[in-house]
């Protein structure tokens, strides 16, 4: 996941993420009496975080019951900083092993810590493969997933007869030569508004399987081919399935 763009008018997006609370591999502690008193004394603030992470060691973003995730790790760090349990809303559900260059999440807190100090405070409690780069106070209606209007993913293919150890966990090793011009013609077919029900994991609960793809670029730099796609949203595993389809187009 490479970047996200957000609507300027946050008040247009008042839907709050209803992700389950307390289902992670840890049990979120109950809100203490001291925190309840703090809430009464100070208004709740909505804090948006920008972060980047290497996803190799994590089972995606979403908090899960028995495995370690990026969302869970960030929640634990934030709770240690602000002194009370928090719930993070992420701008998208990255899959296991997926990295993020620019990822946005938000949470609510009554703590008075200045925003310019939050990244430093959080990073002292985070592992080195997750880094918070910015924090800012946003409108109370801002929601990282509801306010997100564009998402961009980049998928890398290492196209060479010999592996490169520096691209392990970073690129798909594909030894047979690929023609990026043929792959680009196939990628162009995905641009526009389409029903992507056929290229997603079954069993996912969504209101609509229609998404709009804004751009899909296939570019080669030596042995490295990058597939970069941007859209208003993606279904579960749609990006992986479409990327894996492109190399096979030469054989059709």
Please annotate each region the language model reported:
Residues 66-78:
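Short catalytic helix/loop segments, enriched in acidic residues and glycine
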Residues 51, 107-111, 157, 176, ...:
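Short beta-strand-to-loop capping motifs
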Residues 86-110, 141-142:
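Short, charge-patterned binding micro-sites
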Residues 118-124:
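Short amphipathic alpha-helices in soluble, non-transmembrane regions
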Residues 47-52, 153-154:
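Active-site-flanking beta-strand signature of metal-NTP-handling nucleotidyl enzymes
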Residues 2, 19, 23-24, 28-29, ...:
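Short, low-complexity intrinsically disordered segments enriched in A/P/G/S/L with frequent Arg
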Residues 242-248:
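Conserved small/polar residues in nucleotide/adenosyl-binding loops
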Residues 130, 135-230, 240:
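Non-catalytic RNA-recognition surface used by pseudouridine synthases
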